[in-house]
Each structure stands twice: as C-alpha cells, then as structure tokens.
C-alpha cells in the first residue's frame, strides 16, 4: 500500500516513544502512520441483518473483512470507487450501512459489553452520528438516546445521519457537555463521552493533523476533558456505565484523565477491564484495563477507550443558571391519538409503546417514552421524529417517519426496479409499466422504504426531499 508524508513534530515523537509500551515497535508505529487508512463500514442492523446485507452485495465484488470488535463492522475494498463513491451507492442512501472508521466502533462495543442493556443513554459529543446510530442499532431503536453536539454547524449533519438510518428513539441537544452533570443529575443508565481531543490518532486520514500540535495544547485539552468527564459522571446513575474515548495517543488526554476521576471520587469509580472485549484485545490493554490502541496493533486509527462504572451516588453539582422555557408540545391521547394511529397504520407506518404521540399546532410527533422524564429539565433542538402535518384532507406523512417506521411488506408497498429507483433518487416521478392500485403508495427498493407517494393516474409523484436528491450513477453493476 502506498505511503503518504505525515507531519510529525519532534516533541510528539519524543512523547510517543515514552508512551508506547516496550512490546511495540516504534518503527512500526511510524510506518503504520504513513499508510493510508483502510476504509470500513458498519451494517445498520435496524434495517437489514448482516447475513442479508452480505447476500445483497455479493454480486458487486466488494471485498469485506470482519472487524473483530464489531460483528456488523467490515473493512471494505472496492474496484469501482472512482466511478461510484461508496457514499453515493443506493445501499448507503437507504441507510443500510454507515461509513465509519473501525476504531470508532470500539467505544460502543465497550458500552454494551457484558450483556449491558441500558434504557436511557447519552452520547455527549455525538456528531456526525456514527456512534449514536451504532448505539441505536444496539438498542433496537428502543429506550432513548440523548445525542448532544456542541457545534451548531454539526447538529444538522447529526440529524441527517440519524434520519437516513431510520432511528426513532433519539433526542438532539446543542450544549456544552459540561452542563449535563448539573442539569440532568444521575439520569442516564449509560453515557458515551467520545471527547474532543488533539486528534493524534487520525494522521493516517489527515497527514497534516499535527500541524498545530503542541505539548501545551495537550494539557489545555485535557483540562476540558476532565470537566466533561466530571459532568458525564454526575449525569450517570449509580450502577451505570460510562465509556470515555478519544482518537488521540498521549497519556495526558487518556489514562491521566480517567485516573484523575478515580482520584477525585475514589470508591465511586470502578474501572471495568476491557481485555476480553474481543479476541486479541489484550494487545492494546493498559495496566488499568483500558485499551490504548496504537495504529500498528490492528492496522487502524489510533484510539483510546476506557470503561467505568459508577458505584455510588455523588453530591449534586450547583443548579444550572439557564432557563429551559415553555415546552411547546402537548400529549396526544384518546380519540385523537387513535385516529392518527389508524391513519398511519393504513399507509404502512407502525410503531410500538416505546413511542408516544405529541402535538404542536398542526404537527404530530413521536417521542421516545424514556426521554419524557427529561422534559422541562433541558432544552431540546429536536426530539423524536416528526410523524405528520395535519390538513383538511388528512395527514401529510413526513419522510423521516417513513424511513424509520414503514413496513416494507405492507399491502401498499410498491417495489421499484433499478431504473425506477435511480429516477426516484434523482427526484423524478415514476411511470411504472403496471401502476399500483392504491392512491397512497409506500415506495420501496431492495425491500427498504424510500418514501410515501401519491399515485396520480399512471404516475407515482415523487416525494423524495429536494435536499436529498442525487445525480449521477447510484447503483453498482448496472449500466
């Protein structure tokens, strides 16, 4: 594999020599950093099983190598990347897989280790959504996830990925993560803090990642990480699990941050060793039981993962100073709720008791039940999924609800051909040889929902959101 020139500050190399265990070769570390990163994907098991996905893509000639710490994760090699980028394939557009670096699948694997089944989870630094969507898949779209992102520009990307993957159990917030310990004390069964860091592990993807690196900046970042971890630990219920991770390699931002928490809260903190997380995990194991993944160990990005348990309750942090404001939604119950549910079921949209109906003026939403106890304690950027807008003639069903809730075997489902599916993704109306009988049509391809549409005569009117429309080649193997 070709190498690329990575910028290494001298002080960084000195620091790595000191941090690296004697069992690892420093020359192999440098060599690994200079190799381009292997691409990897994670199959979205909310939409398709691993076996069915592998059968679906078998004719494409994609070479998939299993990632040992993630059953649904694979390194991928393709010959047609230039003609058809992976992110433009129909399987990606319909949410069947997520393009995710292999190392970044580790934190969620750790969060759910030892048969852990949390019902309310927080992803404290969630964008662009790889770990949030992985958590949702592990939860089977049940329970609830609070996905927080401090960067306003990244919240939109986070929502787009959640929507594409058909996720219904998530609430989005836009806060500095340091507020949650005070705002939502001991409210979560599990928390993932994939902390902002110096990014030393990403040089295989970005050869200039260390251009602005300095030992001083590492210490500044570690101070912020301690505050975020402190907040996360306060927001975790006693007995709950917290995973702290970074994509950096120095000890100040990794082991030292976790040891600081242990020193601060003593017996309230238990380190849960990760040596049995997957075969050969012990090759990256630290004396504390953390995983310090140097890139040459598994031929992936550099990464760090620690798993902690909260053993006892902590004194509350000072109450937050902000005002949440009035909540603009009201529960939809009784006859109204029944009417909405029956109308949705009639077009193939189904949900269970995990989701509750709420209303804001003419908008109808579905909120995860597990998140309702947080209402009034924190301001949400977006909560649950928008199901419909009501109008004089009924309901206008929303695209994100169709992707998350539609039953592809419903009587109104209409399976598109390859050519028709390409037309759909390009935003064009469909003229099938044999039009569907029903006026309300659940459009599917590869037995996955693409949207709800109206039949007008012999034409299926395209309802694909304009902002998602794609041009160019979208399918592997067709002309």
From Swiss-Prot:
Catalysis: reaction(s): cytidine(1407) in 16S rRNA + S-adenosyl-L-methionine = 5-methylcytidine(1407) in 16S rRNA + S-adenosyl-L-homocysteine + H(+)
PROSITE patterns per record: NOL1_NOP2_SUN, SAM_MT_RSMB_NOP
GO terms of molecular function: RNA binding; rRNA (cytosine-C5-)-methyltransferase activity
Enzyme class: transferase
Alphabetical GO biological process terms: rRNA base methylation
Keywords of this entry: Cytoplasm, Methyltransferase, RNA-binding, rRNA processing, S-adenosyl-L-methionine, Transferase
SUPFAM superfamilies assigned: S-adenosyl-L-methionine-dependent methyltransferases (SSF53335)
Active site: 247
Recorded superkingdom: Bacteria
InterPro entries per the UniProt record, alphabetical: Methyltr_RsmF_N, MeTrfase_RsmB-F_NOP2_cat, MeTrfase_RsmB-F_NOP2_dom, Nol1_Nop2_Fmu_2, Nop2p, RCMT, rRNA_ssu_MeTfrase_F, RsmB/NOL1/NOP2-like_CS
Family to which the UniProt record says this protein belongs: Belongs to the class I-like SAM-binding methyltransferase superfamily. RsmB/NOP family.
Main function: Specifically methylates the cytosine at position 1407 (m5C1407) of 16S rRNA.
Protein name: Ribosomal RNA small subunit methyltransferase F
Organism: Salmonella typhimurium (strain LT2 / SGSC1412 / ATCC 700720)
Source species taxonomy: Bacteria, Pseudomonadati, Pseudomonadota, Gammaproteobacteria, Enterobacterales
Recorded name of the encoding gene: rsmF
